[in-house]
Regions:
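Conserved non-cysteine loop/helix-boundary elements of the Radical SAM core domain that shape
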Residues: 1-122
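A C-terminal junction/extension of Radical SAM enzymes
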Residues: 91-167
Length: 167
């Protein structure tokens, strides 16, 4: 924050412990809640959470529970991505489970449709492919004004100057 950063994004994915173990992303809700609250206290002006549907061992109930928990924290923006299963890539990330552990296309579609419905009910606005924002967020305002931009990371309210990825 002291270096001028004002936006922060957390790669939540899902809060189900079995799903988290399968994707090697252990981060209990209480931890995400704490760092989200700290970011708000420090003064970050835009907080985003990334959620993923179609993860191994994930079902519709998991997706909806994750959305409920995430919405209780009121991040300004949400990305709601579809999981891409590419087990041939090096590393252990997608080799800790079997192909049949990944939800089938019909279930993924249901997770997206029901998840989107819940996000809209909870006050988020659909910006475009897999992005949602609250009304007060600059990305939503840019969407409304017709000045939204897109880069390889998703939508943005301004042209990308510098992007730094950590982790």
């Amino acid at each position: 924050y002291d270096l001028g950063f004002r936006r922060v994004s957390y790669g939540v994915q899902d809060y189900n412990e079995k799903v988290q173990k399968a994707i090697h992303r252990i981060q209990p809700f209480e931890h995400v809640k704490q760092v989200t609250e700290w970011a708000k206290e420090i003064g970050y002006t835009s907080i985003s959470h990334d959620l993923v549907f179609g993860l191994p061992f994930q079902n519709l109930e998991d997706v909806l529970n994750t959305i409920d928990q995430t919405s209780s924290l009121m991040p300004d923006r949400l990305a709601f991505y579809s999981y891409a299963h590419v087990p041939w890539i090096k590393g252990n990330g997608q080799r800790g489970f079997k192909d049949h552990d990944v939800p089938k296309d019909e279930m993924k579609r249901q997770c997206y449709e029901e998840g989107k419905k819940k996000l809209l009910e909870q006050g988020y606005h659909e910006i475009g492919m897999d992005h949602f924002a609250l009304e007060q967020d600059p990305m939503y305002q840019s969407f409304q004004a017709g000045t939204l931009h897109r880069n390889f990371m998703g939508y943005t309210a301004s042209k990308t100057q510098v992007m730094i990825g950590l982790g």
